[in-house]
Amino acid sequence: MRRLPEQLLHPARRRAAIAALQARRAPTSVLVLCNGNIYRSPFAAAALRRALGGPEGTVAVDSAGFQGPGRESPKEAVEAAARRGIDLTGHRSQLVTPDVVRGAELIVVMEAEQRRAVRERFGRSPRDVILLGDLDPEPITSRSIVDPWGRRATVCAASFGRIERCIGALVKALRHAPADRAA
């Protein structure tokens, strides 16, 4: 019963998120954030880079988190990502800072609380921060993309699957965004 509002609101939130992305100028830089920058955001950033055409594409994609820098992605994250063709072996977590946030035209987060934190702590406009789960093309039970930290490997695999679906929708929306419209 608790998740019913999320399910009912999702279609409208999805339409609004896609419309907002398509109404803005296509970004040249994207920052993907999650709590620790060891599971969701590094995977999402790598998936976005791949979907946009690789690391040398026209859009710079980076990731960061709200907790300690310099940490490796856990074994289960590396393995789950590898099964999806993404290499996280060299990833080290990066702490989100004002400079990192300032350098991004679009910020993608995994949870509503993170969206709020970016807006409050770093003064970013709501239009610059998108909740990735709002783009999910499938019915949902939660806007947030589940944090696999401390959970079974199956949770990591499911989170990565949802991230890939949402990244596909994000890329599709960005490809329909005007290249020359003012941000």
Q: What is each of the regions a protein language model found here?
A:
Residues 67, 110, 132:
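Conserved residues at the C-terminal ends of beta-strands
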Residues 32, 109-110:
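Short beta-strand scaffold positions
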Residues 5-103, 173-182:
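Conserved active-site segments centered on acidic
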Residues 1-16, 116-183:
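Phosphate-binding/catalytic loops
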Residues 36, 92, 114, 135-136:
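Short, flexible active-site-adjacent loop segments at beta-strand->alpha-helix junctions, enriched
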